[in-house]
Amino acid sequence: MNQERLYTVLRGPHISEKSTVIADGAGQVVFQVAPDANKKEIKAAVEKLFDVQVTGVRTVNAKGKRKRFGMIRGRRRDWKKAYVTLAEGQDIDFLGGE
C-alpha cells in the first residue's frame, strides 16, 4: 500500500456526543475519512499513524444536507465516517491532555 495514500485516508476525528459515548464504553474511535477509502486502507492508516491495534472497521456514507446560502439553494458535500474498534486496553487521545 502506498505510504502517501495512508496519510490522505484519514481526514480527522469526528467529535460528537455519540462518538464520545462510544469511545468511553465500547473502545471505538470515529474518524472522518476520504469517500473513496476502503476498510483495509482505514485500518492500515490508523495502525500506522497512532501505533495501535485495530480489530474492526465499520463505515457509513453520510449524505450532504440541503442548505440555503442567501437566495441560492445548495447542498453540502457527501462524506464518509469510519467507526474503528481498537484492541482491548488501547486508546487514542485526541486532546493530548495528561
Curated annotation (Swiss-Prot):
<dbReference type="Pfam" id="PF00276">
    <property type="entry name" value="Ribosomal_L23"/>
</dbReference>
<dbReference type="InterPro" id="IPR012678">
    <property type="entry name" value="Ribosomal_uL23/eL15/eS24_sf"/>
</dbReference>
<keyword id="KW-0694">RNA-binding</keyword>
<dbReference type="GO" id="GO:0006412">
    <property type="term" value="P:translation"/>
</dbReference>
<dbReference type="GO" id="GO:0005840">
    <property type="term" value="C:ribosome"/>
</dbReference>
<comment type="subunit">
    <text>Part of the 50S ribosomal subunit. Contacts protein L29, and trigger factor when it is bound to the ribosome.</text>
</comment>
<comment type="similarity">
    <text>Belongs to the universal ribosomal protein uL23 family.</text>
</comment>
<dbReference type="InterPro" id="IPR013025">
    <property type="entry name" value="Ribosomal_uL23-like"/>
</dbReference>
<protein>
    <recommendedName>
        <fullName>Large ribosomal subunit protein uL23</fullName>
    </recommendedName>
</protein>
<dbReference type="GO" id="GO:0003735">
    <property type="term" value="F:structural constituent of ribosome"/>
</dbReference>
<comment type="function">
    <text>One of the early assembly proteins it binds 23S rRNA. One of the proteins that surrounds the polypeptide exit tunnel on the outside of the ribosome. Forms the main docking site for trigger factor binding to the ribosome.</text>
</comment>
<dbReference type="GO" id="GO:1990904">
    <property type="term" value="C:ribonucleoprotein complex"/>
</dbReference>
<keyword id="KW-0687">Ribonucleoprotein</keyword>
<keyword id="KW-0699">rRNA-binding</keyword>
<dbReference type="GO" id="GO:0019843">
    <property type="term" value="F:rRNA binding"/>
</dbReference>
<keyword id="KW-0689">Ribosomal protein</keyword>
<dbReference type="InterPro" id="IPR001014">
    <property type="entry name" value="Ribosomal_uL23_CS"/>
</dbReference>
<dbReference type="InterPro" id="IPR012677">
    <property type="entry name" value="Nucleotide-bd_a/b_plait_sf"/>
</dbReference>
